[in-house]
Amino acid sequence: MQKKISLSDKYEKREGKIFLTGIQALVRLPLIQKDLDAQNNLNTGGFISGYKGSPLGGYDLELSKAQKYLDEKSIFHQPGLNEELGATAVWGAQQGEFKQRGKKDGVFGLSLIHI
């Protein structure tokens, strides 16, 4: 008997075959990182930024669609005004621990830039 396939599988399913697009896989990547960190007893947060006009333009839209899943795992998405500012924002989000201001064990980041 085959299990029902749900549209939410792309972000909720943890094993077996998962049907998703390449951009949805990039959205899933930080969700997986958060789960791996939790398995290793790390209380991390995530920060994603990038330029809406980047060559991977649909990424911001897909992140917005997945906002519920990002919020559940303390992953924040903030579009950048340009690629450089997006990358700088990710770097800045990771600096809290250096000044003893962080509320997490660390922040993993993702910034899409066109090289």
Feature roles, as predicted:
Residues 1-113:
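Thiamine diphosphate
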